[in-house]
């Protein structure tokens, strides 16, 4: 009996450990700033064909602040049967695969595990489809919901031809453009999607709808940091630079970084690596492609002012549709944000300590490559809340900053520019007490000398 109980306990323990291990990816994927953020893939079968179906596949970026930048998304899956792709509109498979079994009417793709990408802007009209042809770039949901959606049409053959015989694809993978996303199983949605005509007078319905949800995890992405933060203030001469080696360390390997004043700069930038996704950064102690500088600029009676500067140190990438997320307790009292768009994310309900900022369209929504034009800046005006406001102990600096969804490396809090000792309340109190003591002593000595002088005359 004891052996049986011991064995049962061991099995229960193993089951518990297995459950925890299964939960790890999901726990890592949880984003406290955007707990419901995800990318949803909707697969709508709209028409049956003699050997398969026609489907509309739509990708929704429901993430508040994380977008998909160039070279864009790529979506992969594995067929449940021996399906093929006869044709596509609004997207294309990256590889055709082995279609040698077909003598005529060659399919678009015969691979068991196709991977599809978006078409680039300017694609031929007969290849386009609604919400296509953005080069795979999707904005975040907060910035521009209309451009946070992509669609393509796919004609599938050698599959089922009814609701009972058709099977959903499996093993979905999403790259945007690199790793980081984990996708779940395709789930059938009931009732299926309904489509409204352009004139709004007719509604049609998909035969079958499947949904796939993909979530982002920095643990899965395993990316090195891509940005860092530096700090300064009007009340302290100290400039706190980005931490050394925040995104990597300089090495002696040629081409690992470029000096900004190098006479060979143009030849290196336009060299063999041009067009590569690997950053070519200016040689700095931090080696980050992006630096965010927070400067406490001015202090008024009822307000205080901050200047934020984003600098691109990467010679190989323009950052289009960039965004910045900042956590600071005084965003509850933000008054004006100049030259940036602004929206509170409110991840904790009523507490407003997280703000998202991005560029104004056609003005500063494009962060140019490293160089004279490789920066954007704004100023923020905060109203003072007398119950919480202070410049003491680094309170005026942000708790956390994210650029394009990636957490930036912050300086150590003990390095933050603090108020000089003469500005602290404790020092002012001691100074006042000492002043009263000195004045009292002088008054006492004065009176004592006057009395001694008068008594001497008596």
Swiss-Prot record:
InterPro entries: COB_C, COBRA_pln
DNA-binding is among the record's keywords: no
GO BP: cellulose microfibril organization; plant-type cell wall cellulose biosynthetic process
Membrane topology label: Single-pass membrane protein
Cellular localisation: Membrane
Signal peptide (residue range): 1-29
Family that this chain belongs to: Belongs to the COBRA family.
Name of this protein: COBRA-like protein 2
Source organism: Oryza sativa subsp. japonica (Rice)
The encoding gene: BC1L2
């Amino acid at each position: 009996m004891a052996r049986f109980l011991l064995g049962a306990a061991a099995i229960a323990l193993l089951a518990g450990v297995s459950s925890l291990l299964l939960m790890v990816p999901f726990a890592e994927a949880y984003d406290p700033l955007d707990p419901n953020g995800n990318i949803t893939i909707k697969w709508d079968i709209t028409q049956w064909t003699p050997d398969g179906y026609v489907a509309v596949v739509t990708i929704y970026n429901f993430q508040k602040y994380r977008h998909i930048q160039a070279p864009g998304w790529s979506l992969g899956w594995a067929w449940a049967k021996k399906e093929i792709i006869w044709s596509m509109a609004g997207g294309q498979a990256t590889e055709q695969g082995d279609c040698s079994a077909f003598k005529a009417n060659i399919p678009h793709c015969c691979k068991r595990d196709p991977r599809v990408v978006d078409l680039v802007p300017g694609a031929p009209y007969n290849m386009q489809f609604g919400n296509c042809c953005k080069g795979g770039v999707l904005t975040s949901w907060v910035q521009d919901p209309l451009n946070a959606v992509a669609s393509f049409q796919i004609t599938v053959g050698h599959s089922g031809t009814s609701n009972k015989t058709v099977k959903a694809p499996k093993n979905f993978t999403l790259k945007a453009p690199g790793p980081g996303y984990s996708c779940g199983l395709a789930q059938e949605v009931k009732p299926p999607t309904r489509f409204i005509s352009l004139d709004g007078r007719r509604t049609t319905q998909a035969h079958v709808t499947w949904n796939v949800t993909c979530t982002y995890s920095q643990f899965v992405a395993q990316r090195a940091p891509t940005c860092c933060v530096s700090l300064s203030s009007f009340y302290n001469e100290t400039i706190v630079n980005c931490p050394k080696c925040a995104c990597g360390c300089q090495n002696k390997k040629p081409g690992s970084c470029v000096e900004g004043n190098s006479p060979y700069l143009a030849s290196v930038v336009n060299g063999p690596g041009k067009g590569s996704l690997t950053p070519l950064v200016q040689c700095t102690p931090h080696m980050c492609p992006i630096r965010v500088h927070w400067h406490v600029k001015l202090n008024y009676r009822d307000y205080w002012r901050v200047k934020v500067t984003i600098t691109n140190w990467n010679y190989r990438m323009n950052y289009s549709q960039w965004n910045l997320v900042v956590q600071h307790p005084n965003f509850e009292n933000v008054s004006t944000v100049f030259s940036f768009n602004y929206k509170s994310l409110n991840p904790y309900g009523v507490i407003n300590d997280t703000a998202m900022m991005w560029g104004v369209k056609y003005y500063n929504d494009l962060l140019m490559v490293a160089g004279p034009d490789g920066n954007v800046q704004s100023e923020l005006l905060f109203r003072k809340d007398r119950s919480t406001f202070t410049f003491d102990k680094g309170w005026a600096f942000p708790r956390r900053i994210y650029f394009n969804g990636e957490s930036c490396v912050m300086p150590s809090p003990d390095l933050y520019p603090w108020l000089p000792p003469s500005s602290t309340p404790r020092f002012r109190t001691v100074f006042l007490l000492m002043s009263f003591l000195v004045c009292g002593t002088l008054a006492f000595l004065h009176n004592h000398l006057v009395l001694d002088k008068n008594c001497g005359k008596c």
